[in-house]
């Protein structure tokens, strides 16, 4: 009886050629596991392709609900970005996928997990750290670090030699990752940063200049940092994301073209579409500005940066990330209320916020008189606040500086 390997399978170029390669080079029974995080693929076609290519069994695992509820909404509450721009769509999906791969490996008695991540990318780290977090005894097979295939052109040639149908050509060679949160585009002419990316590559988004000429309004209601209602209607997490993606996509929202610092040390360029996520981030940030005090808000910005780095680096299941979650939860206890946004040709603008726990008081913040704040009080405050700088100036003057 052959040993088994569970392959993280998408039906794309890399994982399609890995099935025959594993059978040839390891003599293993290949179990293909497609973890559905909202790719919008024809899953029956994915299943049939895996079997046709040589898999002995195929798992199609729909984890969209868990992905949105436990991963994406956690990202919204923490307001995480990588290098101030990337909403971490790929990074957020990998820990859940790794967890499910381990569960399938245990159910099947498999000794190995295989993936199609390249030896230059971040995903190899994310998958393997995720697997090790649940079962460090499982073996890892990473073909891109082993085989003689050195480029996507080589991979296409190998696929053709094995009669494997793949969804790319040497002329259309972008590498894409899609889920319910985003689409990423890498490779091809994007590798030269002088090249403007082509809007024809977009999957989820209308180019801003071609978006509709009318303004769209949307109102989101949050409870303790979690989006619950859209335009007054309570929606389950997956439907919430699907609706926001459609609305954001129609209005050209959420396109990012950036050069980022990969975990493995090199820089890479990616184009990201995150229409619904960009809307959620804008609404949540507007609500936080009214409901979180200054010191906590400023400290949370530092926490958010570190949290984003942990997620990017594949450390979702780390003790530090668990500790940061505890901090974030406390900050969200009063982040409840409604945010109205205006969407227009790639722009998201706040059009009103209503929060029952708002720390903003119109009477105090206005230029008029207030029982809690007398304009004359500012004079004493300024004297105390500026005291260190007065002392510094006096000392420098005495020394002749």
Curated annotation (Swiss-Prot):
<keyword id="KW-0436">Ligase</keyword>
<comment type="pathway">
    <text>Amino-acid biosynthesis; L-arginine biosynthesis; L-arginine from L-ornithine and carbamoyl phosphate: step 2/3.</text>
</comment>
<feature type="binding site">
    <location>
        <position position="175"/>
    </location>
    <ligand>
        <name>L-citrulline</name>
    </ligand>
</feature>
<feature type="binding site">
    <location>
        <position position="123"/>
    </location>
    <ligand>
        <name>L-aspartate</name>
    </ligand>
</feature>
<dbReference type="InterPro" id="IPR024074">
    <property type="entry name" value="AS_cat/multimer_dom_body"/>
</dbReference>
<feature type="binding site">
    <location>
        <position position="272"/>
    </location>
    <ligand>
        <name>L-citrulline</name>
    </ligand>
</feature>
<keyword id="KW-0067">ATP-binding</keyword>
<dbReference type="GO" id="GO:0000053">
    <property type="term" value="P:argininosuccinate metabolic process"/>
</dbReference>
<dbReference type="InterPro" id="IPR018223">
    <property type="entry name" value="Arginosuc_synth_CS"/>
</dbReference>
<keyword id="KW-0055">Arginine biosynthesis</keyword>
<feature type="binding site">
    <location>
        <position position="184"/>
    </location>
    <ligand>
        <name>L-citrulline</name>
    </ligand>
</feature>
<dbReference type="Pfam" id="PF00764">
    <property type="entry name" value="Arginosuc_synth"/>
</dbReference>
<feature type="binding site">
    <location>
        <position position="118"/>
    </location>
    <ligand>
        <name>L-aspartate</name>
    </ligand>
</feature>
<feature type="binding site">
    <location>
        <position position="91"/>
    </location>
    <ligand>
        <name>L-citrulline</name>
    </ligand>
</feature>
<protein>
    <recommendedName>
        <fullName>Argininosuccinate synthase</fullName>
        <ecNumber>6.3.4.5</ecNumber>
    </recommendedName>
</protein>
<keyword id="KW-0028">Amino-acid biosynthesis</keyword>
<dbReference type="GO" id="GO:0006526">
    <property type="term" value="P:L-arginine biosynthetic process"/>
</dbReference>
<feature type="binding site">
    <location>
        <position position="86"/>
    </location>
    <ligand>
        <name>L-citrulline</name>
    </ligand>
</feature>
<dbReference type="GO" id="GO:0004055">
    <property type="term" value="F:argininosuccinate synthase activity"/>
</dbReference>
<dbReference type="InterPro" id="IPR048267">
    <property type="entry name" value="Arginosuc_syn_N"/>
</dbReference>
<dbReference type="InterPro" id="IPR048268">
    <property type="entry name" value="Arginosuc_syn_C"/>
</dbReference>
<keyword id="KW-0547">Nucleotide-binding</keyword>
<dbReference type="Pfam" id="PF20979">
    <property type="entry name" value="Arginosuc_syn_C"/>
</dbReference>
<feature type="binding site">
    <location>
        <begin position="8"/>
        <end position="16"/>
    </location>
    <ligand>
        <name>ATP</name>
    </ligand>
</feature>
<dbReference type="InterPro" id="IPR014729">
    <property type="entry name" value="Rossmann-like_a/b/a_fold"/>
</dbReference>
<feature type="binding site">
    <location>
        <position position="122"/>
    </location>
    <ligand>
        <name>L-aspartate</name>
    </ligand>
</feature>
<dbReference type="InterPro" id="IPR001518">
    <property type="entry name" value="Arginosuc_synth"/>
</dbReference>
<dbReference type="GO" id="GO:0005737">
    <property type="term" value="C:cytoplasm"/>
</dbReference>
<dbReference type="GO" id="GO:0000050">
    <property type="term" value="P:urea cycle"/>
</dbReference>
<keyword id="KW-0963">Cytoplasm</keyword>
<feature type="binding site">
    <location>
        <position position="122"/>
    </location>
    <ligand>
        <name>L-citrulline</name>
    </ligand>
</feature>
<feature type="binding site">
    <location>
        <position position="260"/>
    </location>
    <ligand>
        <name>L-citrulline</name>
    </ligand>
</feature>
<feature type="binding site">
    <location>
        <position position="116"/>
    </location>
    <ligand>
        <name>ATP</name>
    </ligand>
</feature>
<dbReference type="GO" id="GO:0005524">
    <property type="term" value="F:ATP binding"/>
</dbReference>
<dbReference type="InterPro" id="IPR023434">
    <property type="entry name" value="Arginosuc_synth_type_1_subfam"/>
</dbReference>
<comment type="similarity">
    <text>Belongs to the argininosuccinate synthase family. Type 1 subfamily.</text>
</comment>
<comment type="subunit">
    <text>Homotetramer.</text>
</comment>
<feature type="binding site">
    <location>
        <position position="126"/>
    </location>
    <ligand>
        <name>L-citrulline</name>
    </ligand>
</feature>
């Amino acid at each position: 009886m052959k040993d088994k390997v569970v392959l993280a399978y998408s039906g794309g170029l890399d994982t399609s050629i890995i099935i025959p390669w594993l059978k040839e080079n390891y003599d293993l029974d290949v179990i293909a596991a497609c973890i559905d995080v909202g790719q919008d693929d024809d899953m029956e076609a994915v299943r049939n392709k895996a079997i046709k290519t040589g898999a002995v069994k195929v798992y199609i695992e729909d984890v969209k609900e868990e992905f949105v509820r436990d991963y994406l909404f956690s990202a919204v509450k923490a307001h995480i970005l990588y290098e101030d721009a990337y909403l971490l769509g790929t990074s957020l999906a990998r820990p859940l996928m790794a967890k499910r791969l381990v569960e399938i490996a245990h159910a099947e008695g498999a000794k190995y997990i295989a993936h199609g991540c390249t030896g230059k990318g971040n995903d190899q780290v994310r998958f393997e750290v995720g697997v090790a977090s649940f079962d460090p005894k499982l073996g890892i097979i990473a073909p891109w670090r082993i085989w003689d295939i050195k480029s996507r052109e080589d991979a296409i040639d190998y696929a053709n030699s094995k009669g494997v149908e793949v969804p790319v050509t040497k002329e259309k060679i972008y590498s894409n990752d899609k889920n319910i949160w985003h689409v990423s585009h890498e490779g091809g002419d994007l590798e030269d940063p002088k090249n403007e990316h082509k809007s024809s590559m977009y999957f989820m988004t209308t180019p801003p200049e071609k978006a509709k000429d009318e303004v769209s309004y949307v109102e989101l209601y949050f409870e303790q940092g979690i989006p619950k209602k859209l335009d007054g209607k309570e929606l389950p997490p997956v439907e919430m994301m699907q609706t926001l993606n459609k609305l954001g996509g129609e209005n050209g929202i959420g396109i990012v073209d950036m050069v980022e610092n990969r975990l493995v040390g090199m820089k890479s360029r990616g184009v990201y579409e995150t229409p619904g996520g960009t809307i959620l981030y804008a609404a949540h940030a507007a609500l936080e500005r009214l409901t979180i005090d200054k010191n906590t808000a400023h400290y949370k910005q530092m926490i958010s940066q570190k949290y984003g780095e942990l997620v990017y680096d594949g450390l979702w299941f780390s003790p530090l990330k668990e500790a940061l979650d505890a901090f974030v939860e406390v900050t969200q206890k009063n982040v409840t209320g409604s945010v109205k946004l205006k969407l227009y040709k790639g722009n998201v603008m706040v059009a009103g916020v209503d929060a029952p726990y708002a720390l903003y008081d119109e009477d105090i913040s206005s230029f008029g008189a207030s029982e809690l704040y007398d304009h004359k009080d500012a004079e004493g405050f300024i004297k105390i606040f500026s005291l260190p700088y007065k002392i510094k100036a006096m000392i420098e003057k005495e020394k002749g500086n």
